[in-house]
């Protein structure tokens, strides 16, 4: 007979563990089924390890530029194995902390690969036959790297994001297929550690989801760093074994580059196959994502889905928010649906990119009478002091109305976006933000200056 809980959670990544922690904080008895250590892709193969290696790249870049500040440090060398060790120490510390937190809230963590055997009864079975059921079931099985037809990941020639995060020696030359957030982060990191990078994007510009002016600014910065970025590029062939010949066609014509590895970075697929969902009546779309309503509930009453298995932004903080909505819905509380077009995004390449809300193009497509302001970091005292004056803050607003979107490319953009997100989420007007005092000298002043510009009375 299956053990009974208030909520059974299948999957221990950000969506799953957030569901468990928030539910337990609300007094619910929770079972969490996870096949590996808790933490999921974000903690073990995504956000945390990637940003740890990007921080290594930043330190290397900073030391190389130390002479500009009058600091003689010589030419630095990189021990990537030591960097990987530090990365793993960060992961282990966070994982242990998460395990301790789950234990402290009395969440029952069950090790094993779970399968839904009866969605109506909210029952899950693991490989050793253990069964648990609940008054509600939350699906949070995550995602895996998506490959291209004929380009199966082999760990030597064709690499996924998982493989890239395990490099022990910097490759000499790579081609990266896909210039979205992850592709641009990899391009930036590898260029910093000495790799010759060719970045290929099939759509008309790199970072195709961001505002066009931000994309152009990042492409310009990449060119200055000798990252060979090609938008509108279609890969026509990949040949060879040890040395790979990558042929592609783009606006510049047909080109071939020789590389050591090809990194495929075109997104992630939901892990929904083979876990009993369709057999249980859980509705999936043609790409395998679970269909949910605004309260994260599936077609089966009492069964919810959160995180990467839902066709929403595949971001850990979005999974956290979805987990809260799911638990509030289970408790019968007022759970406001998430406004996905307003959530903040952070891309940790150099220079960093961050945004929240609508791009200028999206705002115009939705019929807004749009006004914009662009303020450059080159005029900001703090940006010049830290030696990173490249980039812009762009604000998209409705004429005589609220701020619709904030888009940043430049130093510490992933931290600066917090103020932009609050402005977008609270539908603040440029006039309201322009009355706020920004400390000087700070990078945040650039955002304040942009709001002043939208009032028609810029200060600088």
Regions found by a protein language model. Give the residues of each.
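Glycine-rich flavin
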Residues: 2-5, 21-28, 33-170, 198, ...
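Beta1/beta-strand and adjacent pyrophosphate-binding region of the FAD-binding site
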Residues: 2-13, 172-180
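Short hydrophobic core segments
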Residues: 8-10, 114, 132-142, 177, ...
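Flexible, glycine-rich terminal cap/loop adjacent to redox cofactors
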Residues: 10-15, 19-36, 48, 52-59, ...
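N-terminal Rossmann-fold NAD(P) dinucleotide-binding loop
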Residues: 16, 183-184
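A structured beta-alpha segment of the ubiquitous adenosine-cofactor-binding alpha/beta core
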Residues: 127-130, 235, 248-256, 268
């Amino acid at each position: 007979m299956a053990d009974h809980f208030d909520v059974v959670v299948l999957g221990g990544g950000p969506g799953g563990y957030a569901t468990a922690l928030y539910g337990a904080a609300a007094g619910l008895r929770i079972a969490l089924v996870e096949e590996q250590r808790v933490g999921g892709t974000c903690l073990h193969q995504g956000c945390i390890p990637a940003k740890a290696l990007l921080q290594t790249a930043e330190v290397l870049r900073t030391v190389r530029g130390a002479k500009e500040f009058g600091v003689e440090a010589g030419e630095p060398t990189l021990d990537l194995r030591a960097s990987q060790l530090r990365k793993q120490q960060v992961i282990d510390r966070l994982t242990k902390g998460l395990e301790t937190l789950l234990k402290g809230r009395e969440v029952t963590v069950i090790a094993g690969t779970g399968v839904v055997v009866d969605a109506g009864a909210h029952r899950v079975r693991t490989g050793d036959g253990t069964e648990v059921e609940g008054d509600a079931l939350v699906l949070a099985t995550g995602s895996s790297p998506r490959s291209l037809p004929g380009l199966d990941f082999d760990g030597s020639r064709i690499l996924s994001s998982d493989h890239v995060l395990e490099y022990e020696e910097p490759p000499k030359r790579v081609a990266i297929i896909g210039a979205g957030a992850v592709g641009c982060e990899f391009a930036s990191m590898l260029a910093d550690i000495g790799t010759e990078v060719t970045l290929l994007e099939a759509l008309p510009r790199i970072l195709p989801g961001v505002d066009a002016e931000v994309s152009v600014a990042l492409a310009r910065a990449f060119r200055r760093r000798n990252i060979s970025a090609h938008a509108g590029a279609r890969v026509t062939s990949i040949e060879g074994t040890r040395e790979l010949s990558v042929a592609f066609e783009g606006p510049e014509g047909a080109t071939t580059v020789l590389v050591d590895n090809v990194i495929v970075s075109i997104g992630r697929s939901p892990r929904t196959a083979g876990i009993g969902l369709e057999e249980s009546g859980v509705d999936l779309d043609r790409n395998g994502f679970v269909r949910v309503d605004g309260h994260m509930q599936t077609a089966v009453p009492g069964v919810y889905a959160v995180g990467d298995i839902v066709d929403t932004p595949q971001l850990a903080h979005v999974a956290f928010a979805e987990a809260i909505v799911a638990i509030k819905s289970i408790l019968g509380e007022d759970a406001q649906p998430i406004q996905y077009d307003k959530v903040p995004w952070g891309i940790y390449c150099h220079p960093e990119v961050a945004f929240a809300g609508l791009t200028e193009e999206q705002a115009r497509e939705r019929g807004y009478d749009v006004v914009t302001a662009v303020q450059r970091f080159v005029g900001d005292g703090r940006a010049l002091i830290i030696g990173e004056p490249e980039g812009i803050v762009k604000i998209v607003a409705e004429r005589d109305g609220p701020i619709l979107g904030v888009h940043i490319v430049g130093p510490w953009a992933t931290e600066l976006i917090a103020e932009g997100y609050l402005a977008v989420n609270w539908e603040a007007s440029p006039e309201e933000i322009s009355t706020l005092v920004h400390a000087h000298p700070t990078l945040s002043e650039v955002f304040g200056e942009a709001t002043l510009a939208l009032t028609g009375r810029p200060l600088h």
